[in-house]
Amino acid sequence: MSLTAGILAVQGDVSEHAAAIERAGQTHDTAVNILEIRESGQIPSCDVLLLPGGESTAISRLVHREGIADEIYTHARANKPLLATCAGLILLSRDSGDDKLETLDLLDVTVERNAFGRQRDSFEAPISVTGLDEPFPAVFIRAPAIVEVGDDVDVLAEWNGRIVAVRQDAIVATAFHPELLEDSRIHDLAFF
């Protein structure tokens, strides 16, 4: 079996996410073709889509200006798997807490940006994630927290009483960076 995985490649850990998706694919005997999304017209050929971290305001401006936002929306509305991490979570949210940031309103959540502090406050913590047998070593870098969820959103993980991972339909979103370690279970949970 094969799978085409699109990764929004305007910012973030593209190669690390690609490696994680490929590792997850290997555990399912699935060949993964990685497509780095940089312009409109690429997402329709993707089976799954990943929106990595970065600076959410810059990413929002780029995807809207380049016509990529409409394709992300169409992908999600077709109930195709989508994993959004950190800034990707903010981009998909209903409310980012910033009126200047245009979100896609695909995920019925409200987020608080930089909820765990600035860059120097980055940390790793083992968290229990629904669907995983063992705690996941989550890396938080300028991470948002989810402060409100809609009725159709399943909370997958919390850390210190704050929501850090959710699922709504075929969308999995995390406040942390699952790509920074050799553990590909979050990518597996989202795509396989």
Task: Tell me the role of every PLM-derived stretch.
Residues 56-128:
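Cysteine-nucleophile active-site neighborhood
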Residues 13, 92, 181:
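Glycine-/small-residue-rich active-site loops that bind phosphorylated ligands and cofactors
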Residues 1-65, 70-77, 184-188, 192:
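N-terminal beta1-alpha1 cap of cysteine-dependent amidohydrolase-like domains
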Residues 26, 96-97, 130, 146:
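Short polar/acidic secondary-structure junctions
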Residues 10, 85-87, 107, 142, ...:
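A secondary-structure boundary/capping signal
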Residues 50-51, 84, 174:
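Redox-cofactor binding/interface segments in oxidoreductases and associated redox assembly factors
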Residues 3, 30-32, 80, 102, ...:
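A structural micro-motif
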Residues 113-192:
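Amide-donor transfer/coupling interface in amidating biosynthetic enzymes
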